[in-house]
Amino acid sequence: MSTPAPVGFTGIFGGGPFYKTGNFDIPKNIAEIEHSGFSEAIVWSVEVNSQGDLNFNGEFPLTSNGVYVGNKTYPKFAADMATLKKAGTVKRVTFSIGSSNYGDWENITSLVNAQGVGPKSILYKDFKALKKAIPALDALDFDDENSYNLPTTVKFGVMVGKLGYHVVPDPYVDASYWQSVVSEINKKLPGTVDGVHLQAYAGGQGNNPCSGWNFGKVPVFPGVWDKNYTPSQVQAVMRGWHKECGIIGGFMWIYDDFVGNGLAKKYATAINKGVK
């Protein structure tokens, strides 16, 4: 049986514009991304507290005691995630866990060490509840920027893989650590990690997906920041990487900078043309 060819995703990270009804016209934003040319919508960022409860950005509680509570704050969020994939270009909805903030992945490590990853553990309950409440959710982006605990990250990755999620690491440094994460998770549950979001901006400025970031058959999707590049420049950068090592996807950081001004479609087109 032949291994299926890797799928390339053109992704866009965004925070409040995907859910914050008091600040944004959410139906308009959802429609903009749905028909933008992006194939992956990455909602950022899931915080994990010491009890294991999940929330977006300290302002949108998602789970409490292993139960989905998102409807109390934004009752249309689950339906909006489904709409993203309904009739346009978006094929994958991903939630990103962690950030440069200290704590989220440290809490995951502590919880895995204390409770394991079985059905009775809080993290298992959380991510099972999240998947059930938001069936459109396909993948989890692992944005660990300060914990780097291999055993617990692998256990957590395999756990969410068994719950039906794909895993997409989101590194900006320490390639060898992330190569171990990818190989160990896929060794235990083949196919779980099916892409890598490589940060080539901010702390990862200067990263090159063609140099030092080889994950074997798992494709690397480099990301750039709109503050650094116009759409035409993004296309040129992606085309250079595509010519150098055959990248098949990439992503933009961050939708919050260019909501509703037409740039979403221009950036998606730039990446899509660059990686062909």
Labelled PLM ranges:
Residues 2-240, 244-245, 253-274:
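Chitinase-like catalytic core of GlcNAc-active glycosidases
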